[in-house]
């Protein structure tokens, strides 16, 4: 039987029209963006997999209802870390995987990260500050899983571990 995989993703901003322009997303409208994000997610994640969602799921009226409807459409067991646009989820979580310690948090500049000695996996910065917050930053020990950086689909923790072991900066997943 195949193992459950662990995936990470942040900042989908479902239903948020302005994010398309603000973050230069390759979609012509919200419907196309929502459909593509759902399809990409479900092409990668199986029902038994775990997805750590690091904040900013959806921006819309009737947010709670819309979020519930949206979650029905997404594969996997989803663990929420609260983003700056969310009212639910843990503030952060620390996990160990393959001998590494990871803090999962929305904003890497949060005071929670100050004395943490492992790797910080975060969102929040989208692809707006890639020099400081690229996909993989060995110097800062940070990993940016905002959708714009990981090509709009969840990224596996196995791939992240492989990349941090190489010790090189990776600006976006498209640079691999």
Curated annotation (Swiss-Prot):
Gene Ontology molecular function: any one: hydrolase activity
InterPro entries per UniProt: Calcineurin-like_PHP_ApaH, Metallo-depent_PP-like
Highest taxon of source: Archaea
SUPFAM superfamilies, per database record: Metallo-dependent phosphatases
UniProt name for this protein: Uncharacterized protein MJ1445
Species this chain originates from: Methanocaldococcus jannaschii (strain ATCC 43067 / DSM 2661 / JAL-1 / JCM 10045 / NBRC 100440)
